[in-house]
């Protein structure tokens, strides 16, 4: 066997084995860019608000709601409702 063929085979096998280790062979997961970082809720909501959960990408389905974290996990909190319930005894 000619020496340049042996070198070519060794080079190709080395590149094929090295690509998955470097991590450049696969594309990045597109859902990681969509996930938002949640902030702590600005009020301590009552337990009834723990039923409204955020989606997996930390957004809310309902309009005028914000995803935030509290003692019961990530919840969708209405931007106006907790303040109304705090003002009305």
UniProtKB/Swiss-Prot annotation:
GO terms for cellular component: extracellular space. The keyword Signal applies. It comes from the Eukaryota. Its main location: secreted. Keywords: Secreted, Signal. GO terms for molecular function: serine-type endopeptidase inhibitor activity. GO terms for biological process: antibacterial humoral response; innate immune response. The keyword Transcription regulation does not apply. Residues 1-23 form the signal peptide. It is found in: Secreted. Although this protein was isolated in a region containing several WAP proteins and was defined as a WAP protein, it does not contain a classical WAP domain. This is Protein WFDC9. It comes from Homo sapiens (Human).
């Amino acid at each position: 066997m000619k020496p340049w063929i042996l070198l070519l085979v060794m080079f190709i096998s080395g590149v094929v084995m090295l690509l998955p280790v470097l991590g450049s062979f696969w594309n990045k997961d597109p859902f990681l860019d969509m996930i938002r970082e949640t902030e702590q809720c600005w009020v301590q909501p009552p337990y009834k608000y723990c039923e409204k959960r955020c989606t997996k990408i930390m957004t809310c389905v309902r309009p005028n709601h914000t995803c935030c974290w509290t003692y019961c996990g990530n919840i969708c909190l209405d931007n106006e409702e907790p303040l109304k319930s705090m003002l009305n005894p």
